[in-house]
Swiss-Prot record:
GO terms for molecular function: glutaminase activity. This is Glutaminase. Substrate binds at S76, N126, E170, N177, Y201, Y253, V271. Homotetramer. The keyword Hydrolase applies. It is an enzyme of class 3 (hydrolase). Pfam families: Glutaminase (PF04960). InterPro entries: Beta-lactam/transpept-like (IPR012338), Glutaminase (IPR015868).
Length: 334
């Protein structure tokens, strides 16, 4: 187990924050609750003992522990970034005609649309994400995929690739997603070829990342769309408010309300076992641990984020000092 990063020329220095995440990793690494996602055959093969925590601050400091270099497919966390790309392509008003922003108490893969508008409820559930991905511009399937991969590169700071075995596994078993897509096609929420739209959705979910990558992506959102490691603008800053608002209200599926109450920061989970959380103007947090609870969220990930929020005073509505400035983001106090 490593407790520091060695990625390029990133600045690493001893910090109370590193002790906090080391202690949390030690506390929860023996936890055996939850089960690995098994409805996608390739995901069922993942080692349930993998566990890592990464934090990247908006000034580029990195703190991490555990299996933070272990690659895994990004899955539903990709929905956050596809939504941002759709906003850049069409603007918020048009995107709102196709995908709502309302939380839903239903499961993330529920075959359901808003009864009045016939839109999917929000971009963070499967139906909404499929509709969002179908909005991404491009002359053809290859160009749209390349735009998605280039988008991820800006957020992460290096090239990414699609795990073909996971993509084909999801494609061959994604019948609920096809049902959602056909339902949305019927109501005019998708106007693209169904299989082409689904292929891009499955491909974006099968992009390979590690825990460090997720933390950099979260820190980019925390830094108004600027990657704190590379300095590159990954997404137009005007859409950060939209992205974080939907993450806060809808990002944790039908656990979103309890998450907002207990943790109080924008976040997105995925059935890969990843959780990505954003503390605006401060840091990005990522946790990877494959065993999931009944809602599809990482068991260890939820517990770690709850404790980080409590110990560091990260809840958006908590007015208190976060630290003494030693870990590079200064004090957060009202």
């Amino acid at each position: 187990m490593s407790d520091q990063a060695n990625q390029g020329d990133l600045e690493i220095r001893p910090s109370p924050l590193l002790k906090v995440i080391n202690d949390l990793h030690s506390k929860y690494k023996s936890l055996k609750e939850g089960i690995v996602a098994n409805y996608i055959p390739e995901l069922a093969k993942v080692n349930p003992d993998l566990f890592s925590i990464s934090i990247v601050t908006v000034d580029g400091q990195v703190y991490q522990v555990g299996d933070y270099q272990q690659l895994f497919t990004i899955q539903s966390i990709s929905k956050v970034f596809a939504y941002g790309l759709a906003l850049e392509d069409h603007g918020r008003d048009y995107v709102l005609t196709r995908v709502g922003v309302e939380p839903t108490g239903e499961a993330f893969n529920a075959i359901i649309l808003d009864e009045q508008s016939k839109r999917p409820y929000n971009p963070m559930v499967n139906a909404g994400a499929i509709a969002t991905t179908s909005l991404i511009k491009g002359a053809g399937a290859t160009e749209r995929l390349n735009r998605v991969l280039e988008m991820f590169r800006r957020y992460i700071g290096h090239d990414v690739f699609v795990d073909i075995s996971v993509f084909t596994s999801e494609r061959s078993t994604g019948h609920r997603n096809r049902a959602m897509a056909h339902l949305m096609l019927n109501f005019g929420m998708i106007d693209r070829n169904i299989e082409e739209a689904l292929d891009l959705y499955f491909q974006q979910c099968a992009v390979m990342v590690n825990c460090h990558d997720l933390a950099v992506m979260a820190a980019t959102l925390a830094n108004r769309g600027v990657n704190p490691i590379t300095g590159e603008q990954a997404v137009n800053s005007r859409y950060i408010k939209d992205i974080l608002s939907v993450m806060y209200t809808c990002g944790m599926y039908n656990f979103a309300g309890e998450w907002a109450y207990k943790v109080g920061i924008p976040a997105k989970s995925g059935v890969c076992g990843g959780i990505m959380a954003v503390v605006p103007n401060l840091m990005g947090i990522a946790v990877f641990s494959p065993p999931l609870d009944i809602r599809g969220n990482s068991v260890r990930g939820v517990k770690v984020c709850e404790e980080l929020s409590q110990q560091l005073g990260l809840h958006l509505f908590e007015c208190m000092k976060v630290g003494n400035g030693e870990w590079g983001v200064g004090n957060c106090e009202c």
